[in-house]
Amino acid sequence: MNLVDVIIPTYRPDNKFLVSIKRLLAQTVAPGKIIIINTDKAVWDRTGIEEKLKELFEESDTKLILEHIEKQDFDHGATRNFGVSKSKAEYFVCMTQDAVCFDKKTIEYLLRGMDKSIKMTYARQVPDKNANKIEKFTREFNYPAESMIKSFNERQTLGIKTYFASNVCAAYERETFDALGRFDTGQILNEDMLFAYKLIENGYFVKYEAWAKVIHSHNYTGVTQFKRNFDIGASQASNPHIFKNIKSESEGKKMVFKTMEHLLATHSYISAIRLIYISACKYAGFLAGKNYKKLPKGVVRAFSMNREFWR
C-alpha cells in the first residue's frame, strides 16, 4: 500500500500544470499515484497535454491515473471524493492544478505534521513572482511564516479562521476522512473548510504547516473578486450551522486595514487606491452571495464564478 497519493482536479490545464507535476515527481516523499480528475475531455485532447504528461512519468515509479468527467458533473466535493476512491494510500494530498511545490519537501512536511490528533494539514501559499503588491501581502497575511494547530478551543480567539483550510494543497489521513463522511457534496466551494469543521467538531485538530510551501497566487480583477466572493457568501449562507454564529467580516476588515497600512508605508499609492476598489468588489460580492436566495436565478448565475453550479 502506498503511503500517500495526490489528487488533482483539472480544467483546461496549461504548461504550469506540467511544472507542478514535475515538482511532485521530485518530492522526497514521492506519491505512489498522481490521480487527475479532468473536466471536459474534448478540450484536454485538443491541447495535446496528455502526451507531454505521460513523458514525465516514464522515468518515475509514481503511477499516473487519469479520469475524465463532463463539465456538468463537476462538484468540488464529489469530484475530489471520486479521486480519493482511486487511492488506497494511508494519506492523500489534494492540490489544485495551478499550485506548484516550492521545494522537494512539501509532501514530507505535510505528512510530518500529522499525529494521533492532527488529521489534516495544509500548506503555506507563497505568491508567484508576478503577483501584484496587494496579492503578495494578502498571501503573507493569510499564510504567515509560523505554523499553527487549530482545535475547538481556538474558536473564541480565531473566529472563522479556526476552520480555514485550503485544498490548494492539503493532506488528509484516509481512515478519518472516510469515517467522517468524506467531503460534503453539492457545495459551490469550501469543501476543504467544511471538512475541517467536521474534524474540529469531532475533537480532532487541523494544522497549518508553514514549512510545507506551494507557489500559488492570482492577480484577480475587481469583477472576478466580486464573483469569487459571491460564491463564498453563498457557501456561508448555505451552511448556517457553521457560519451563523461566527462572523468573517471582521477578519476581512483586518486584512484590508493591514494591507492598506503596508501599501502606504511602502509608498505604493496606486496600489492603495486599487485596494479600495478591490475591497469594495469583494465585500459587495460577499453580501450579494449571503443573500443569494433573494435574487432571481439569472442574476445569481451572472454573479457567480461557477455558473454551472446553478443550472
Where are these regions (language model features)?
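Glycine-rich, basic loop-to-helix element that forms the pyrophosphate-binding segment
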Residues: 70-87
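Acidic donor-binding loop at a coil-to-helix junction in glycosyltransferase catalytic cores
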Residues: 189-195
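Short, flexible, basic/aromatic active-site loop/helix in glycosyltransferases
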Residues: 141-162
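Short beta-strand/loop segment that forms part of the nucleotide-sugar
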Residues: 32-42, 67-69
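Non-catalytic, C-terminal membrane-associated alpha-helical segments of glycosyltransferases
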Residues: 231-234, 238, 245-311
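Short, well-formed alpha-helical segments that are part of the catalytic scaffolds
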Residues: 13-26
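Conserved donor NDP-sugar-binding/catalytic core segment of glycosyltransferases
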Residues: 104-136
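Short aromatic/hydrophobic "clamp" motif used to bind/position activated sugar donors
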Residues: 92
